[in-house]
From Swiss-Prot:
Belongs to the FMP52 family. GO terms for biological process: import into nucleus. It holds the Pfam family HIM1. Its main location: mitochondrion. This is Protein FMP52-1, mitochondrial. It is found in: Mitochondrion outer membrane. It comes from Scheffersomyces stipitis (strain ATCC 58785 / CBS 6054 / NBRC 10063 / NRRL Y-11545) (Yeast). It is a peripheral membrane protein.
Amino acid sequence: MSAFVLGSTGLVGLQILKVLDSSTAFKKVSTVSRRLPSVTSGKINSIEKKESEEWPAIIEKEAKDYSAFFSAFGTTRAAAGSADNFKKIDYGINYEAAKAAKAAGVETFVLVSTIGANAQSSFLYLQVKGQLEEDIIALKFPRTIILRPGILLGERETSKGLLNNLSVGVLKYLHGTPLTFLGNPIFGAEVAQIAVNAAQESFEKGDEPVVKFYEARELTELYKKL
């Protein structure tokens, strides 16, 4: 199998890269990012390209007939600086990458979204995530897998702000306890393992594309079986 990873320097994307690197099922792994990920190996082809507008052409060339494409790419409104920039980054880059992956003949598209994603939401973050989900499904990959994790735990290379850091600091102590339902906290490494496992599962190609959602509570239950 072969895989392309978008967002390989982020919390979940980096963990996906690590899982793929250690997997015996995946023989070839590629990624593109503004800076090189911290994981390196002979299996991984990491492409450093600061200009994200050039990523689709790279993806269409490098991901030709790949088994799977994983996107854990994203930002926050605070980091983006404005609502328009947030949409341009979180939706625009992801969607253009997905179109390139479809043109390249990728079989399975795996999107790491978020709990509560809904294109009709009044909250910008959830609205953008929901619209991205809908539009990627509309591309009709043979199979689309969407994960909607709750609060993501783990060490980030870049901070998402004091409030986020404080909430994560509290919720990590609820992880795996009966109070897990409060935010459904889950480690990025666990989401990554579930994502890669899901992409490895066989499926029957039919007239209609396969679409599979993994909701936050389901993810927190699945990690217990890893």
